[in-house]
A protein has these predicted regions:
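Class II aminoacyl-tRNA synthetase catalytic cores and aaRS-like
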Residues: 1-505
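Alpha-helix C-caps/helix-loop-beta hinges
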Residues: 116, 200, 521, 550-551
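Short, cationic-aromatic polyanion-contact patches
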Residues: 504-511, 525, 555-568
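Hydrophobic residues on short alpha-helical segments
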Residues: 511-518
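Short acidic, hydrophobic short linear motifs in intrinsically disordered regions
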Residues: 523-533
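Short amphipathic alpha-helical interaction segments
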Residues: 535-549
Length: 568
């Protein structure tokens, strides 16, 4: 049964009262708006005659009742607008119910209103709407958090708890307008990138999200099962291999913005569902791709911010090209002080041990090099930097380096210590590609759960011939973090993945006593806990059974000893 707060109970009563007055709290009719608050604030002073008959809709966000007249604020998708409402204007007849009862008593903060009237300037110079007609469009039965701002813009009692904000993004967007700006910027970033690609004549495409073979990246997939076909399928970890099939099919350039899924950990820069852009262009190599990426990101930054140097945390990042280029081996030599270029797997394990880097037996040479790089190099790459020329074991889909044996033509772009982009000169030799896949199968047999699977259909496509090509992947979420100066990926995702929400549990007085003791020490010996609680045998048994049944505590038996702990 739903437990309602006092305000929620009152709002439901207000809803019933509105219906008794013949007012539908949720009317079906459209309300044809003809202006936004942003338009009014931007253009009113120069186009006053255009705002004599306007219709605007949005949430009621504040209200100051002063007898037969009141001021308030309405918030639409673009911002807020003050309005002035008089009883006799919206109630020209003798019946003053709409103002005296509906507006003053039955409306609440968060209700959606449709207002009609004209714009004027108050004596204090504030652009405002003089309301002549008011329509209730939707009644809110749950109160919004109260966010108070002083004259200097300081926020008090704000809706600021990160977990609540991410779970209830709909509330976050309503009461924290700067959050909406982040997502508007995200949309603009994607639009600018798409425009750049289209201007170059490359085709936007769509490829399968459900795939029979999880390929194109080193990551753990999410698996599912197709009942009709009776076969396992995977949510894609990358779209690379399908895009390359289209290059085989004759397209000179294809790109895709899409969701990828990786069944891995969550942290400040990782979400199991994320957005990536991948592009493949025929007759190009990774050197050309570096120049293209510089031009792309420089243009996007300029369009979004009007400049190429922007703050990221406490640093200033300059996205104007050209970017620094450093080979992977040289970067490890510079920041870790060791030359790994000639080390075999055994030597790399010794190096990891000396550097206090944890590794396991499933890791081959490429993974070991990558572990050293991640631990000792990444955090130092603040300004945009290309790390190039990776060990062949790390990248089974990239072409062998044209001059350096044992390496492949690959680069990753790092900014502020994080990888933003990944690109190759694409491997188009089907024999070499098959051998690389076979090496991946050997790693999988050793227990490497990030090893790639064999994709026979992709190999068949390569056998028909693929032109020399270069491919690129950019993490849209991380790029957005940079260009909006956000420190966590959750801030740039409307609905990030969250752990299951813990439900509030009602506890008896005896259960609360035990719970409070376990908050101080958990786990604890069952016998010791019983002594501390000092409950009678029956009350103790009922309370412990209740806590276990509600999922609050668990008992662990080891031999003759029994301990009690809180459930995480």
């Amino acid at each position: 049964m739903q437990v309602l707060s006092e305000q929620e109970v009152e709002r439901r009563k207000d809803r019933e009262e509105l219906m008794k007055l013949g007012i539908n709290p949720y009317p079906a009719e459209a309300f044809p708006i003809n202006v936004t608050s942003e338009d009014i604030h931007r253009n009113y002073e120069n186009r006053k005659l255009d705002y004599k008959d306007i219709k605007i809709a949005g949430r009621l966000m504040s209200r100051r009742i002063m007898g037969s007249a009141s001021f308030g604020e309405i918030q639409d998708a673009s911002g807020r607008l003050q309005f002035y409402i008089r009883r006799d204007d919206i109630c020209p007849s003798e019946d003053k119910t709409l103002y005296n009862t509906v507006f003053k008593k039955l409306l609440g903060i968060g209700d959606f209103l449709g207002l009609k009237g004209y714009i004027f300037t108050t004596q204090t110079g504030e652009i405002s709407l003089h309301v002549t007609e008011m329509t209730l469009l939707s009644k809110s039965v749950k109160p919004l958090p109260t966010v108070k701002r002083d004259d200097e813009g300081n926020v008090y009692d704000g809706f600021t708890d990160p977990e609540m904000r991410y779970r209830q993004r709909y509330v976050d967007l309503t009461v924290n307008p700067e959050v909406k700006n982040t997502f508007v910027t995200r949309s603009k970033i994607i639009s600018q990138m798409r425009r750049y690609f289209d201007d170059n004549g490359w085709l936007e495409v769509e490829t399968p999200i459900l795939q029979a073979v999880h390929g194109g990246a080193a990551a753990r997939p999410f698996g599912t099962h197709h009942n009709t076909l009776d076969m396992p399928l995977f949510l894609r970890i990358a779209n690379e291999l399908y895009l390359k099939r289209l290059i085989v099919g004759g397209f000179d350039g294809v790109y895709e913005f899409g969701k990828m899924f990786r069944n891995e950990g969550m942290d400040r820069t990782h979400n199991p569902e994320f957005t990536s852009m991948e592009i493949y262009v025929a007759y190009k190599d990774y050197i050309w791709m570096m120049e293209m990426v510089e031009e792309l990101i420089e243009q996007v930054t300029e369009k979004i911010h009007g400049k190429t140097e922007i703050p990221v945390g406490d640093k200033m990042i300059n996205f104007a090209g050209p970017y620094r280029r450093l080979t992977m081996y040289d970067s490890i030599k510079e920041y870790a002080g060791i030359d790994v270029s000639e080390l075999d797997e055994s030597g790399l394990r010794e190096a990891c041990q000396k550097l206090a880097i944890a590794v396991d037996e499933t890791m081959g040479r490429g993974r070991l090099v990558d572990e050293i790089f991640g631990a000792k190099v990444e955090a130092n790459l603040i300004q945009p930097t290309y790390i190039t020329d990776y060990p062949i074991e790390m990248t089974p889909l990239a072409k062998k380096h044209r001059t350096s044996p044992g390496l492949v033509e690959r680069f990753e772009l790092f900014v502020n210590g994080k990888e933003i982009a990944n690109a190759y000169t694409e491997l188009n030799d089907p024999i070499d590609q098959r051998e690389r896949f076979e090496e991946q199968l050997k790693l999988a047999a050793r227990g490497d759960d990030e090893a790639m699977a064999m994709d026979d259909d992709f190999l068949r496509a390569l056998e028909y011939g693929m032109p020399p090509s270069s491919g690129l992947g950019i993490g849209i979420d991380r790029l957005t973090m940079l260009l909006t100066n956000k420190t966590t990926i959750q801030e740039v995702l409307f609905f990030p993945q969250m752990r299951p929400e813990k439900k509030q549990v009602d506890l008896s007085e005896e259960e609360k006593m035990i719970f409070e003791l376990l908050k101080l020490e958990s786990p604890v010996a069952l016998a010791d806990l019983k002594v501390k609680v000092e409950l009678s045998g029956k009350k103790w048994d009922v309370a412990m059974k209740g806590l276990t049944g509600k999922g609050v505590t668990k008992e662990i038996k080891e031999g003759d000893a029994i301990t009690v702990s809180l459930v995480d």
